[in-house]
Amino acid sequence: MKEVIDTVGRRKTSVARAFLTPGKGTVTVNKRPVEEYFKDEFKRQQALRPLTLCEKAEEFDVKINVQGGGLSGQSGAVSLAIARALTESDEALRAVLRTERLLTRDPRMVERKKFGRKKARKRFQFSKR
């Protein structure tokens, strides 16, 4: 296994780079503990789901740099980056992560605003008569 595994995960407009090194289980996001960065329990669990699912939380130290978007997109990007790093460390984990859909890049993006309208789909009120 390589000393440092470097992977990228994206979600909406967020981009996360994960650096996986053998260690004792510390996870830092933008040089802050994960508990401090993702204060919301759900977003934290979503971000760390690949580690808990594969039961590898105590085997690796994870350093994550994430930028762009909001916390929801960032937690999704972190999750994908960690999942990709785990598959690079151990190919046997790919099947487990694949069944939980953690290796799939979520293609949903914000729909663009169209001209002549207020928002992407919202139209002005229509009057028949």
Swiss-Prot record:
Coiled coil stretches, renumbered: none
Gene Ontology terms describing biological process: translation
One Gene Ontology molecular-function label: structural constituent of ribosome
SUPFAM superfamilies per record: Ribosomal protein S5 domain 2-like
Gene3D superfamilies with a match to the protein in the record: 3.30.230.10
InterPro entries per record: Ribosomal_Su5_D2-typ_SF, Ribosomal_uS9, Ribosomal_uS9_bac/plastid, Ribosomal_uS9_CS, Ribsml_uS5_D2-typ_fold_subgr
Keywords: Ribonucleoprotein, Ribosomal protein
Gene Ontology CC entries for this record: cytoplasm; small ribosomal subunit
HAMAP family for this protein: Ribosomal_uS9_B
Protein family membership: Belongs to the universal ribosomal protein uS9 family.
Protein's name according to its UniProt entry: Small ribosomal subunit protein uS9
Source species: Chlorobium chlorochromatii (strain CaD3)
Lineage: Bacteria, Pseudomonadati, Chlorobiota, Chlorobiia, Chlorobiales
Gene: rpsI
